[in-house]
Swiss-Prot record:
Cellular component, GO annotation: cytosol
Cross-referenced PROSITE patterns: UROD_1 (PS00906), UROD_2 (PS00907)
Taxonomic lineage from the root: Bacteria, Pseudomonadati, Pseudomonadota, Gammaproteobacteria, Enterobacterales
Cellular localization per UniProt: Cytoplasm
Binding, substrate: 27-31, 77, 154, 209, 327
Quaternary context: Homodimer.
One GO-annotated biological process of the protein: protoporphyrinogen IX biosynthetic process from glutamate
Pathway per the UniProt entry: Porphyrin-containing compound metabolism; protoporphyrin-IX biosynthesis; coproporphyrinogen-III from 5-aminolevulinate: step 4/4
Gene3D superfamilies in UniProt: 3.20.20.210
Organism, scientific name: Escherichia fergusonii (strain ATCC 35469 / DSM 13698 / CCUG 18766 / IAM 14443 / JCM 21226 / LMG 7866 / NBRC 102419 / NCTC 12128 / CDC 0568-73)
Site (Transition state stabilizer): 77
Name of the featured protein: Uroporphyrinogen decarboxylase
EC number, as in UniProt: 4.1.1.37
Length: 354
């Protein structure tokens, strides 16, 4: 077993005792940091940054040099899997991700390959191995993937969407095609995450960014069912240590009980769910991660500290809380405000772990 100097994050996910509440930030390696912008400029474009193991490692480590974070998260993108399936991912300036060949019907789905994680996605595994080497056991490394439903939204819509009419048309008019796509994605994501674990990821997270646009019944059928399949297929132990799994559905606060039944170790919460209520509902079945509104980081330091204190009090005493934002950090947040946030979590949480 590789020794970890700081295993707070893993311990909290497994609801084991910790000295203070661990904290990291979604998108902690990102555009709010001037050093990230410099490295991205050096890479040329976003996907070149993802595909260069040394540069992906550099941006993964940048926030850890600034802040005493309790975990590193692999620098990558959720769309690496559809890109490896041959959909032609590209980024339009100011428009976000786009695909040259969106999926329109069952025949398109049938043509999609299941990517080999050590081949088409080998650059991700190289990044994982490089980051693990450079972390030198300081903190654990989180691997991740998008959920099948969320990946499918981009693959069918051809880009990001506000109304999701194209994929919902497929869901209601041709559910068989969508289920075939989701099934293929679930298999691909399982292989992808297991490869990340074998390469050195010590925990994994599934981001279901767009699950919250579904009705309760559709969420169960088209999103949660496939995340459950992935959880069932994941390696749960590696290098002599349990590998915790976190599920995060943005806008999914009403479905926490069902999510907790998947066998995952933790649930991510966005800022619209009250953490005290979430803890009451799931009890000690899973750990909880979250859930400060990322926009709170625009506030003055005293207000940020007040919000941290409120969320810590909401969760209360005991184990099983990983502090995070309710979604990714915004690109124009002052970096020193992120520092205030991280420091406040450690300082103010000590009283809850005595």
């Amino acid at each position: 077993m590789t020794e970890l100097k700081n295993d707070r994050y893993l311990r909290a996910l497994l609801r084991q005792p910790v000295d203070v509440t661990p904290v990291w930030m979604m998108r902690q390696a990102g555009r709010y940091l001037p050093e990230y912008k410099a490295t991205r400029a050096q890479a040329g474009d976003f996907m070149s940054l993802c595909k260069n193991a040394e540069l992906a490692c550099e941006v993964t480590l940048q926030p850890l040099r600034r802040y005493p974070l309790d975990a590193a998260i692999l620098f990558s993108d959720i769309l690496t899997v559809p890109d490896a399936m041959g959909l032609g991912l590209y980024f339009e300036a100011g428009e976000g991700p786009r695909f040259t060949s969106p999926v329109t019907c069952k025949a398109d789905v049938d043509k999609l390959p299941i990517p080999d994680p050590e081949d088409e996605l080998g650059y991700v595994m190289n990044a994982v191995r490089t980051i693990r080497r450079e972390l030198k056991g300081e903190v654990p490394l989180i691997g991740f993937s998008g959920s099948p439903w969320t990946l499918a939204t981009y693959m069918v819509e051809g880009s990001s969407s506000k109304a999701f009419t194209v994929i919902k048309k497929m869901m209601y008019a041709d559910p068989q095609a969508l289920h075939a796509l989701l099934d293929k994605l679930a298999k691909s994501v399982t292989l992808y995450l297991n490869a990340q674990i074998k390469a050195g990821a010590q925990a994994v997270m599934i981001f279901d960014t767009w699950g919250g646009v579904l009705t309760g019944r559709d969420y169960q059928q088209f999103s949660l069912y496939y995340m459950h399949k992935i959880v069932d297929g994941l390696l749960r132990e590696n290098d002599g240590r349990r590998v915790p799994v976190t599920l995060f559905t943005k806008g999914g606060g009403q479905w926490l009980e069902a999510m907790a039944e998947t066998g995952c170790d933790a649930l991510g919460l966005d800022w619209t769910t009250d953490i005290a209520d979430a803890r009451r509902r799931v009890g000690n079945k899973v750990a909880l991660q979250g859930n400060m509104d990322p926009s709170m980081l625009y506030a003055p330091p005293a207000r940020i500290e007040e919000e941290v204190a409120t969320i810590l009090a909401g969760f209360g005493h005991g184990e099983g809380h990983v502090f995070n934002l309710g979604h990714g950090i915004h690109q124009d947040v002052p970096p020193e405000h992120a520092g205030v946030f991280v420091e406040a979590v450690h300082r103010l949480s000590e009283q809850y772990h005595r």
